[in-house]
């Protein structure tokens, strides 16, 4: 689990900085509030050394995910094959932590290109959830899925299925998905 201290200080990065990441890629910092994707990018790069069959990351990465889906679902994007994506989507509906597959078209990666670095850390005004995933895609070379859990990470009111406050979103989802994958492997 990647973690870091996030506070102002003399070594804090600033808009306009170019940072060399774990992977060796350089990132132009346009928005210092997009710090979560910077940490996650290094973690995804670090994971390459283990040659994973699949990596699924979850993060409360963007407010635009909340704007897109409200508190009723979470965006799913990635490079994993469609069958695996469908399996996790099926699990998400089974446990009522619904995922919606968002596209990760090449045009979104184009939005992340920088004139002074390999990539920039934000893509601009449009498709913030997708461009965040497009940024992360630069740091993987294995099957990968990204879940932006921001829409369901915090419940402002209780419902029949979820308590108020921290939701524990994705715990049931991963349990169901992995249970099904283990059952599939045992057959």
Language model features with spans:
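A generic structural signal for tightly packed, nonpolar segments enriched in small/aliphatic residues
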Residues: 1-187
């Amino acid at each position: 689990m990647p973690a870091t201290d996030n506070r102002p200080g003399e070594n804090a990065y600033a808009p306009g900085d170019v940072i060399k990441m774990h992977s060796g890629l350089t990132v132009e910092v346009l928005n210092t509030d997009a710090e979560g994707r910077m940490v996650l990018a290094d973690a995804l790069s670090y994971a390459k050394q283990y040659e994973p069959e699949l990596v699924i990351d979850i993060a409360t990465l963007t407010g635009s995910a909340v704007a897109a889906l409200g508190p009723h679902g979470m965006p799913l994007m990635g490079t994993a094959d469609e069958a695996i994506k469908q399996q996790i989507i099926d699990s998400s509906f089974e446990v009522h932590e619904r995922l919606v597959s968002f596209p990760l078209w090449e045009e979104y990666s184009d939005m992340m290109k920088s004139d002074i670095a390999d990539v920039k850390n934000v893509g601009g005004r449009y498709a913030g959830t997708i461009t965040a995933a497009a940024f992360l895609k630069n740091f993987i070379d294995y099957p990968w899925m990204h879940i932006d859990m921001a829409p369901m990470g915090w419940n402002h009111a209780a419902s029949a299925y979820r308590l108020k406050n921290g939701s524990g979103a994705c715990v049931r989802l991963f349990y169901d998905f992995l249970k099904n994958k283990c059952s599939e492997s045992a057959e």
